[in-house]
Amino acid sequence: MKVMASVKRICRNCKVIKRHGVVRVICTDPRHKQRQG
């Protein structure tokens, strides 16, 4: 899980979602998981 100021999609499998007011990226590749902090 990377905590980034700006979250972006890295590959086409990445999805940007908002969960409890926190922007997250979920992906099939676990290295692409990000959270806005």
Curated annotation (Swiss-Prot):
Disulfide bonds: none annotated. GO terms for molecular function: structural constituent of ribosome. Keywords: Ribonucleoprotein, Ribosomal protein. Pfam families: Ribosomal_L36. It comes from the Bacteria. PROSITE patterns: RIBOSOMAL_L36 (PS00828). The keyword Ion transport does not apply. GO terms for cellular component: cytoplasm; ribonucleoprotein complex; ribosome. One of its GO terms (biological process) is translation. SUPFAM superfamilies: Ribosomal protein L36. NCBIfam families: rpmJ_bact. Belongs to the bacterial ribosomal protein bL36 family. This is Large ribosomal subunit protein bL36. It comes from Bordetella avium (strain 197N).
